[in-house]
C-alpha cells in the first residue's frame, strides 16, 4: 500500500516538474493538449494518493486540506501561465482594444457562425473555455476559505479579480479588455457556487 501511495505522489511530482520545465524553458514548449494531459496526470496522482491513504491517515480532514491546497497551487501556476506568460500570446500581434458593450463579442461569434467565417468548434471552445476558466478557482476558494462560502464575499472577490485580469492582459498586450469575457467568466463561477450550494453536495464540505 505504501508503495502504491509513493507511486501516485511520484507520478504527480514528475508531471509537475515536466510542466515547470515547459514553463521555464525557452526552447521546450508543449501544446495546450499536452499541458492539459500533464495537469490531469497531476490531479490523478493526488486523488489516487488520497483514495489509497483514506484508511491509514488518522486526520483525514487535514490530509484532504493539504492535498486541496497542493492542487490549488498547481492550478494557480497553470492559470497564471496561460493568462499572462504563455509565449504563444507574445508571438501573436494583439490589437489592444476595449469592449464595454455587453454581448457584443458573443453576437460577433454568432454572426461568424451564421456566415461560416469561423468554425463552430472554435466558437464553442472559446465560449465554454471562458465559462470554465475560473471554475476550479471557485471550487478551491469555496472549499479552502470559509468566508468565501457566503455569496457576497465570493461574488465580489471574483468580480474584482476577473476585472483585474482583463485590465492586466490589456496593459501587457496579451489580450483585450472585453466585458463579455467578464460575463462568461463570472457565469462559470456563479454556476459553480449554485452547484456547491445544492444540499447533498453542500454536506460534503
Each model region followed by its residue ranges:
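Extended hydrophobic secondary-structure segments
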Residues: 175-179, 183-187
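Bulky hydrophobic segments
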Residues: 1-173, 179, 193-205
